[in-house]
């Protein structure tokens, strides 16, 4: 959306510049016509008009310079914000944390991945029924609370793990014909 405004601003500046130039050309033609009819040294109005014209030309040139300078500054600002926005986003992502009271650890993620790999390997090998000794630790985790006294989302994770283990035990213990 900003680029549309930028392009529209440039277009307005170009139209304004061409409009001013056509007015200056018209003024010069009318001035040359009146100058040919009267002597410039004897006419004080002509001298004032020349002075006013030179001041107007300077003002016009200066305003064109300021407009182009503003356009350059705006483009530079856009480029800097784009560069800074990317750096800010990267820095923000690096320091972004989870909700208050929870903490993620690379070690725990690694251990969970290893446990999943071991379980899949155990299923593929087709070993017999296995009891899960971690159930004792899970029961202890159920009673754990955060410092503020609220249950965490770990409760849902633990319950999901228990349900998955019960389902896998049921799959292992029942025969294929009993499942239908």
Swiss-Prot record:
GO cellular component: endoplasmic reticulum lumen; extracellular region; extracellular space; plasma membrane; secretory granule lumen
Main location: secreted
Post-translational modification: Proglucagon is post-translationally processed in a tissue-specific manner in pancreatic A cells and intestinal L cells. In pancreatic A cells, the major bioactive hormone is glucagon cleaved by PCSK2/PC2. In the intestinal L cells PCSK1/PC1 liberates GLP-1, GLP-2, glicentin and oxyntomodulin. GLP-1 is further N-terminally truncated by post-translational processing in the intestinal L cells resulting in GLP-1(7-37) GLP-1-(7-36)amide. The C-terminal amidation is neither important for the metabolism of GLP-1 nor for its effects on the endocrine pancreas.
Propeptide residue intervals: 84-89, 131-145
Sites annotated Cleavage: 52-53, 83-84, 91-92, 97-98, 130-131, 145-146
Modified positions (Arginine amide) in chain numbering: 127
Key words of the record: Amidation, Cleavage on pair of basic residues, Hormone, Pharmaceutical, Phosphoprotein, Secreted, Signal
GO BP annotations listed: adenylate cyclase-activating G protein-coupled receptor signaling pathway; adenylate cyclase-modulating G protein-coupled receptor signaling pathway; cellular response to glucagon stimulus; feeding behavior; G protein-coupled receptor signaling pathway; gluconeogenesis; glucose homeostasis; negative regulation of apoptotic process
Sites bearing Phosphoserine, chain numbering: 54, 105, 108, 150, 152
Disordered: region residues: 26-59
SMART domains with a match to the protein in the record: GLUCA
GO terms of molecular function: glucagon receptor binding; hormone activity; identical protein binding; receptor ligand activity; signaling receptor binding
Signal peptide: 1-20
Subcellular location(s) of the protein: Secreted
Family membership noted in the UniProt record: Belongs to the glucagon family.
Miscellaneous information on this protein: In the glucagon antagonist, His-53 and Phe-58 are missing. This antagonist has been successfully utilized to reduce glucose concentration in vivo.
Protein's recorded name: Pro-glucagon
């Amino acid at each position: 959306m900003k680029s549309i405004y930028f392009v529209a601003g440039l277009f307005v500046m170009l139209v304004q510049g061409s409009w001013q130039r056509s007015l200056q050309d018209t003024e010069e033609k009318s001035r040359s016509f009146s100058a040919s009819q009267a002597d410039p040294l004897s006419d004080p109005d002509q001298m004032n008009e020349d002075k006013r014209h030179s001041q107007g030309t300077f003002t016009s040139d200066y305003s064109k310079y300021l407009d182009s300078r503003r356009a350059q500054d705006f483009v530079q600002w856009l480029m800097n914000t784009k560069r800074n926005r990317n750096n800010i986003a990267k820095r923000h992502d690096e320091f972004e944390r989870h909700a208050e009271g929870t903490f993620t650890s690379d070690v725990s993620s690694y251990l969970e991945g290893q446990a999943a790999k071991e379980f899949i390997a155990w299923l593929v090998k087709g070993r017999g029924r296995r009891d899960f000794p971690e159930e004792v630790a899970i029961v202890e985790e159920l009673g754990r609370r955060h410092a503020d006294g609220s249950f965490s989302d770990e409760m849902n994770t633990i319950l999901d793990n228990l349900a998955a283990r019960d389902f896998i035990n049921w799959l292992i213990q029942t025969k294929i014909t009993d499942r239908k």
